[in-house]
């Protein structure tokens, strides 16, 4: 079906931008609509300088604004929904996270039905599967195994419920009598250039004499490069649009990983930044069980102080578990159904990310030098 169009929500974000960069290379695509609450001026400029004949329409609007979503969805063939509030420490109020991640997704699904959009791809997260306990080991898990987060924390809960809504919407009747087909992708922890998590970590290290904070040394994870996650979304869009593949993709979820070596989060951070003189904190750290119970104690303190003071602990049991579990998943189902193979190798991903970290270090070299004196 030539002349198709795609709406990408959260398009100003870390992953959304990469999806757009790959989308404009797609065959027969006539328009990409990019939606976010606010676009930075440099992001707008990048979209307009993509060097493509494909129309790129920039829309600013709120995922909770139903009228905005209906306008954004008019005439669209595929929606790729990446907009989300990622918050594992409770910076934002619980209701705000639920509104954006769950209600926003429900609003967008309804807008698709009203505008007769036939394909919907949801960017979920591995967090919807757990880990529920740092004591339970899951290595090379897959979709045929039942893994579901039992946390009530707003981020994993909202993403889990939103994914359920997306998959339940598969087969919905559209306003024009057509059928809505949906699928969900569950990426592992995403790293790469412009990662907001890596940015925060590097800047914190530069203010601490180049010492990287140790937060996940007990973990075994399989992080995934942002370019490969973006590629998986492109393949999912192709899959839902291809009559031969669509039957196998509809209503399915897929773990998205790549060939990045399985390692701890701390080892990944060190590998990506060691070239620039950063190193892991070698001082003594609390044993994991003690750290977990300390997090529980801080949560109790926060609960009792809440009526009079908004105390937010820097870590909680969910974050301790997330950062210190042995929890990895295979991408074989995505390979089988979507034809997914990592577009970027580990060596290339490592080099690109490390070079970007180098630019961050260079920008803040004065801070590092001052701290080192």
From Swiss-Prot:
It is found in: Endoplasmic reticulum membrane; Mitochondrion membrane. Coiled coil: none annotated. GO terms for cellular component: cytoplasm; endoplasmic reticulum; endoplasmic reticulum membrane; intracellular membrane-bounded organelle; mitochondrial membrane. The lineage of its organism: Eukaryota, Metazoa, Chordata, Craniata, Vertebrata. This is 3 beta-hydroxysteroid dehydrogenase/Delta 5-->4-isomerase type 4. The gene is Hsd3b6. Keywords: Acetylation, Endoplasmic reticulum, Isomerase, Membrane, Mitochondrion, Multifunctional enzyme, NAD, Oxidoreductase, Steroidogenesis, Transmembrane, Transmembrane helix. Pfam families: 3Beta_HSD. It is a single-pass membrane protein. GO terms for molecular function: 3-beta-hydroxy-Delta5-steroid dehydrogenase (NAD+) activity; isomerase activity; oxidoreductase activity, acting on the CH-OH group of donors, NAD or NADP as acceptor; steroid Delta-isomerase activity; testosterone dehydrogenase [NAD(P)+] activity. Belongs to the 3-beta-HSD family.
């Amino acid at each position: 079906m030539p002349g198709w169009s795609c709406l990408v929500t959260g398009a100003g974000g870390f992953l959304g931008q990469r999806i757009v960069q790959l989308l404009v290379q797609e065959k027969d695509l006539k328009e990409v609509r990019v939606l976010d609450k606010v676009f930075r001026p440099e992001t707008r400029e990048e979209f307009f300088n993509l060097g493509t004949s494909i129309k790129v329409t920039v829309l600013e609007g709120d995922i909770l604004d139903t009228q905005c979503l209906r306008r954004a969805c008019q005439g669209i063939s595929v929606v790729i929904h990446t907009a989300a509030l990622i918050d594992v420490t409770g910076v934002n109020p619980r209701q705000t996270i639920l509104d954006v991640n769950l209600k926003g997704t429900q609003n967008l699904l309804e807008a698709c039905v009203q505008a007769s959009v036939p394909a919907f791809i949801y960017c979920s997260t591995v967090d919807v599967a757990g880990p529920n306990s740092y004591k339970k080991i899951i290595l090379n898990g897959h979709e045929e195994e039942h893994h579901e987060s039992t946390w009530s924390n707003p981020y994993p809960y909202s993403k889990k419920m939103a994914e359920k809504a997306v998959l339940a919407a598969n087969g919905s009747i559209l306003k024009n009598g057509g059928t809505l087909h949906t699928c969900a992708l569950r990426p592992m922890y995403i790293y790469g250039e412009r990662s907001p998590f890596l940015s925060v970590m590097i800047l914190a290290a530069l203010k601490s004499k180049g010492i990287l904070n140790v937060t996940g040394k007990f973990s075994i994870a399989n992080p995934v490069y942002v370019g490969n996650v973006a590629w998986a979304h492109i393949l999912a869009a192709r899959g839902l649009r291809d009559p031969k593949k669509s039957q196998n993709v509809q209503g399915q979820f897929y773990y998205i990983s790549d060939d990045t070596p399985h390692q701890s989060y701390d080892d990944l951070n060190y590998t990506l930044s060691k070239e620039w003189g950063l190193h892991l904190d070698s001082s003594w750290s609390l044993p994991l069980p003690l750290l977990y119970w300390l997090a529980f104690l801080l949560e109790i303190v926060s609960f009792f102080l809440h009526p009079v003071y908004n105390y937010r602990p820097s870590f909680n049991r969910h974050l301790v578990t997330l950062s210190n579990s042995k929890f990895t998943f295979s991408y074989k189902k995505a390979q089988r159904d979507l034809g997914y193979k990592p577009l970027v190798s580990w060596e290339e991903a490592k080099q690109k990310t490390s070079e970007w970290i180098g630019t961050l270090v260079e920008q803040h070299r004065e801070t590092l030098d001052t701290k080192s004196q």
